[in-house]
């Protein structure tokens, strides 16, 4: 991707907007936005990617401003066409007793002359190149004939034609990426489009300690099919579904956020509230619409957190007819995903990523469709030490703190429990400093007085206050289920 070409197109779009040539300006803006989008997909550095996304957002705002100007000018044009003929016939018969002036004849003459003038002016202005500014100031009907004259005046015709071609291709791509919700309620389409994670969750693989097997599997299921589409065909098609199983607080949702940040696919964040409605039959439509939108925006990852609340075991006594229909539609749509097997392009895939704390409550048919079922366990000793370093990287730690030794003491704690311990320990110094002070004295404290390093004693006190949230019996249930139904 030529960065100079991106800068030139952005500059030309702004120049055309300043000159009033809004039609050409919109073409350049659409092209440069699409070029930056393609450039972001090729970047691997997250910091550079975020900067380019900010630039793209600024250009998109400028493009919207130009569009609003064009729509305003078009409304003026329509108003003039409507307002001109109306007062003309009303002026004549207003005073029948007075000798009629010759104004009606004079009004009719110019109206008839003005009608063919806009049609003939562009034909006369195709040849001269010095009159294009006047045409731009008078209306947009004269913009298109001015493009070749502007290019010839600048003397870089080949470069301009290439930029125009790229801009038009970018505009076509932007138009293609708008989902057509014909046949569905517009409110349902808007509700699902809001669940597309467009902003960056800012969670990277390095922010998650341990869990190397889970990271490797998610890269294989989401990233590699886009990098090697020729390899992932036939029996080696990408995985259609991945289920993350484990006790609460072990990082299942964090892994999903990392997938949304790192993998560059369209990411749908779906919960039970997204797919439920009080109207009969609307929940099934939402499920079908979700997968149709996912196939349209492919490659796509659909993350369903706490999937046991949506697709529990069928045939139980507390099951309702409406929930059974939703489960059936979800199972049908998941079985029909099969993007890499049926599509010509294996990278146009739809992968369902699910997480649950109760895998034994999931329906058997859904368990079959989630081809990979991985266990997200409690962190190991190495993982606990890494978690302590990640949580304390913005806090000053005293020299007497040995994180490796403390990691051995918190065996059996989940990732969320370790985060709570670190948060409580980092606040111990502040609690000691404000003890016995009045509110006025607390407000008068400086920031440096509160920034005290965390000591080993603070960690010991926090550990006494916070107990682990996962019992040994729960771990045995997860391990028993994984030994019977696991698929790593």
Swiss-Prot record:
What biological process terms from GO does the record include? anatomical structure morphogenesis; microtubule severing; spermatogenesis
Which Gene3D superfamilies does the protein's record reference? 1.10.8.60, P-loop containing nucleotide triphosphate hydrolases (3.40.50.300), Phosphotransferase system, lactose/cellobiose-type IIA subunit (1.20.58.80)
What Pfam families does this protein map onto?
AAA, AAA_lid_3, KATNA1_MIT, Vps4_C
Where is there biased composition of kind Basic and acidic residues? 144-167
Q: Which is one Gene Ontology cellular component term of this protein?
A: microtubule
Q: Where does ATP bind?
A: 246-253
**The keyword Transport is annotated on this UniProt entry:** no
Sequence segments annotated as region (Disordered) = 84-184
Q: SUPFAM superfamilies from the xrefs? A: P-loop containing nucleoside triphosphate hydrolases
Catalytic EC class:
isomerase
Q: Name one GO molecular function term.
A: ATP binding
Return the InterPro entries for the record: AAA+_ATPase, AAA_lid_3, ATPase_AAA_core, ATPase_AAA_CS, KATNA1, KATNA1_MIT, Katnal1_chordates, KTNA1_AAA_dom
Note the superkingdom of the native organism: Eukaryota
Q: Which keywords describe this protein according to UniProt? A: ATP-binding, Cytoplasm, Cytoskeleton, Isomerase, Microtubule, Nucleotide-binding
Task: State the protein's purpose.
Answer: Regulates microtubule dynamics in Sertoli cells, a process that is essential for spermiogenesis and male fertility. Severs microtubules in an ATP-dependent manner, promoting rapid reorganization of cellular microtubule arrays.
Family assignment from sequence similarity:
Belongs to the AAA ATPase family. Katanin p60 subunit A1 subfamily. A-like 1 sub-subfamily.
What is this protein called in UniProt? Katanin p60 ATPase-containing subunit A-like 1
Organism the protein comes from: Danio rerio (Zebrafish)
Q: Taxonomy-wise, where does this protein's organism fall, top ranks first?
A: Eukaryota, Metazoa, Chordata, Craniata, Vertebrata
Gene name, Swiss-Prot/TrEMBL: katnal1
């Amino acid at each position: 991707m030529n960065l100079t070409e991106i800068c030139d197109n952005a500059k030309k779009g702004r120049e055309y907007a300043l000159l009033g040539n809004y039609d050409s300006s919109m073409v350049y803006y659409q092209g440069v936005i699409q070029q930056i989008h393609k450039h972001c997909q090729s970047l691997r550095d997250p910091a550079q990617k975020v900067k380019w996304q900010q630039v793209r957002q600024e250009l998109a705002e400028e493009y919207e401003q130009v569009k609003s100007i064009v729509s305003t000018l078009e409304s003026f044009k329509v108003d003039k066409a409507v307002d001109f003929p109306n007062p003309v016939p009303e002026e004549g018969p207003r005073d029948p007793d007075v000798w009629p002036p010759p104004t009606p004849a004079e009004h009719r003459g110019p109206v008839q002359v003005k009608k063919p003038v806009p049609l003939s002016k562009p034909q006369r202005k195709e040849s001269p190149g010095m009159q294009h500014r006047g045409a731009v100031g008078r209306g947009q009907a004269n913009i298109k004939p001015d493009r070749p004259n502007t290019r010839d005046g600048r003397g870089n015709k080949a470069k301009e034609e290439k930029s125009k071609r790229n801009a038009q291709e970018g505009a076509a791509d932007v138009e293609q990426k708008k989902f057509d919700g014909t046949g569905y309620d517009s409110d349902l389409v808007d509700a699902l489009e809001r669940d597309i994670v467009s902003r960056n969750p800012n969670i990277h693989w390095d922010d998650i300690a341990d869990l190397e097997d889970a990271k490797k599997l998610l890269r294989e299921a989401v990233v590699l099919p886009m990098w090697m589409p020729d390899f992932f065909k036939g029996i080696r098609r990408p995985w259609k579904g991945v289920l993350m199983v484990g006790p609460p607080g072990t990082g299942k949702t964090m892994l999903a956020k990392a997938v949304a940040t790192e993998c560059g696919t369209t990411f749908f964040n779906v919960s039970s509230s997204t797919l439920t409605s009080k109207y009969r039959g609307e929940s099934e439509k939402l499920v079908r619409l979700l997968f149709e939108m996912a196939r349209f925006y492919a490659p796509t990852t659909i993350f369903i957190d706490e999937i046991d609340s949506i697709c529990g075991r069928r045939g139980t006594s507390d099951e309702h007819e409406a929930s059974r229909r939703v489960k059936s539609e979800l199972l049908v749509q998941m079985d029909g995903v099969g993007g890499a097997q049926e599509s010509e392009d294996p990278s146009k895939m739809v992968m369902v990523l699910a997480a649950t704390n109760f895998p034994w409550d999931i329906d058997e048919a859904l368990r079959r469709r989630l081809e990979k079922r991985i266990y997200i366990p409690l962190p190991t000793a190495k993982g606990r030490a890494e978690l302590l370093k990640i949580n304390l990287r913005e806090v000053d730690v005293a020299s007497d703190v040995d994180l490796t030794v403390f990691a051995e003491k918190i065996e059996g704690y989940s990732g969320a429990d370790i985060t709570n311990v670190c948060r409580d320990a980092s606040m111990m110094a502040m609690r000691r400093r404000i003890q016995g002070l009045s509110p006025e004295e607390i407000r008068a404290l400086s920031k440096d007085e509160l920034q005290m390093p965390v000591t080993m004693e603070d960690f010991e006190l926090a550990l006494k206050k916070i107990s682990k949230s996962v019992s040994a019996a729960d771990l045995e249930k997860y391990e028993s289920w994984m030994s019977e139904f696991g698929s790593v």
